Design a protein with these regions (language model features):
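N-terminal helix-turn-helix DNA-binding core of bacterial DNA-binding proteins
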Residues: 2-45, 57-58, 68-79
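Short, hydrophobic-biased segments on the C-terminal half of alpha helices
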Residues: 51-52
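Residue cluster at the C-terminal edge of the helix-turn-helix DNA-binding motif
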Residues: 55-63
């Protein structure tokens, strides 16, 4: 069973259209932070803030190799 705090984090993450678009992009394939930021008028730092919200909700996972951060969808909390 999902606890209310986890559910609140998921709904908060999904409440923003930019984060929903990022999840849509990640549903197609893993992407770097730069690739996720490119379609929007936001900086890499701004994209990183959105990614942190998605990570805290458990919706994505981030892999770091050197300076490259690659994100992938983790739909577990939605099941």
């Amino acid at each position: 069973m999902v606890d209310n705090q986890s559910l609140d984090a998921v709904f908060h993450a999904l409440s923003d259209p930019t984060r929903r678009a990022m999840l849509q992009a990640l549903s197609e394939q893993p992407r770097t932070v730069g690739e996720l930021a490119a379609p929007f008028a936001i900086t890499l730092a701004g994209a990183s803030k959105h990614i942190q919200v998605l990570e805290r909700a458990g919706l994505i996972a981030r892999e770091v190799q050197g300076r490259v951060h690659t994100c992938r969808l983790d739909p577990g909390p939605l099941h």
